Amino acid sequence: MNPLLTLILLASLCAGCVHTYTAKSISRSGVLRTNATALVSLPEDGRFENIVYPGSGRKTALAVSKAFAKQLRTVDVTPQAGALSQHLEQARAGRFDYLIVPTVVHWEDRATEWSGRPDRIEIEIRAVDVPSEKTLSLGSVAGKSKWATFGGDVPEDLLDLPLGMYIDWLFAPDGTPLPQPRAEPEQTMTRPTGKGR
């Protein structure tokens, strides 16, 4: 076989053996405070084409709250989805400093083990200062599963790594570049955690 063709085939096979992630900042006006509190709004369930994935909104909110809880003093989640104005009222009533608004942009759960089509997920995260109602940051994270799998993968498994890196970065000093998650066979990348920044 042609050596070049062999290399191309091997590279394409290796690419299918890893999850891939991205984290993107759209806007950021300052550093979030670690001694603050936050309310995470429950987003609407994700969908792909005409398929709605029940419970995906709650899974997203829990993943976002878990990541913010590593940095903030207190984090809670709203009991149901609703309008931004409604969630701001709840945040004010609960004396929260920040309202975190995740939105499920894309949620695609595939039987990858036999279809070869990967799971995909994209979440937008907005951080709002409750007293001023000003948006402090807006960004998104995304993940695509490996296609070489024996099954059991679900889209929410792709959230922890890029979410953690993006949310940790919101507490980093101004000028700190947003790190990009590397493609990993499994979600084993370690990253700095804790509230000492």
Question: Predicted segments — roles?
Answer:
Residues M1-C17:
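Sec-dependent bacterial lipoprotein signal peptides
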Residues P43-D45, T103-E108, A142:
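Generic short beta-strand segments
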Residues S65-E89:
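Short beta-strand->alpha-helix linker/helix-N-cap micro-motif
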Residues G46-G55, E113, A148-D153:
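Second-shell loop/turn segments in exported
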Residues V18-H19, G82-L136:
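Surface-exposed short loop/turn segments
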Residues E122, V128-R182, E186:
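Short secondary-structure boundary motifs at beta->alpha junctions and helix caps
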Residues G16-L72, F171-R197:
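A structural "domain/chain start" motif
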Residues S56, T60, V64, H87, ...:
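Stable alpha-helical elements in mature extracytoplasmic
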